[in-house]
């Protein structure tokens, strides 16, 4: 039903997969002249122009996935996304600024030097150029559906890679299939990125425990094929999910072994990954804090704050 259309990005992950069916486009890619020109060529090869696209479906609000939505919206396309994604995409610079403020303080409390915390949280400012704000016309969540080329696509919520993640499920050539964004990838393990609190003063989401639960539920839905946001199709979704969960369990146990005395999240990150460059420290902290959250949820560690430092220690 959907045709995969790889779109170039300026990011380390490489090309992002857009998906095209009739006049509907899923995840058009980042807002760059290179991506726009490439996508126009791909559409022209199918006797289409940007003005012909009537509907954009967005799996999650990361710049490499939704950035070009604004150009299509300006040409009359409707934009469909989860309400949480819609809120982020409506003011991406403002969302990023709030994230920077939260994580600058949080990373210092995790044991990061103030100068490093500044550098880590300032890096995403470069993303703003590729993600102009866009208004969402249709807001959907689990249980809703959208029509594409005469077919009903069911929406389900996902957790773990970004706020406001959703999948679009449909009956395809191999059976039950779904476009899943970056929640499950064929060749690389998705990053369980840290997320700020949903509102000021609230607790931050514990992303990795929720991601593990979401993956287990998705595995039990018994899909036959996933269409991911990067690289090739996932031909054995339950098996791939099991592999990801096994990787998570192995890393969680590595973290547990390291907590025989009080450790900060930064010390855990250093133990896991060594001397990471600044560009890799946000995903590194996401991994370290995520596995500490898993251990905390299982009552295997105690957590306390001393002298403005968060410390974890194994209870076993």
Q: What role is predicted for each listed range?
A:
Residues 11, 230, 235-258:
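Short alpha-helical segments that sit at the start of domains
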Residues 23-24, 84, 144, 151:
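Well-ordered beta-strand scaffold positions
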Residues 254-316:
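C-terminal regulatory/interaction regions
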Residues 23-25, 56, 78, 177-178, ...:
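Hydrophobic "anchor" residues on beta-strands that sit immediately upstream
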Residues 21, 27, 60, 72, ...:
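Divalent metal-coordination and catalytic microenvironments
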Residues 31-37, 41-145:
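Active-site HxH/HxHxD metal-binding segment of metal-dependent hydrolases
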Residues 31-32, 150-240:
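Metallo-beta-lactamase
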Residues 1-46, 168-187:
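Conserved beta-strand hairpin/beta-sheet module of binuclear metal-dependent hydrolase folds
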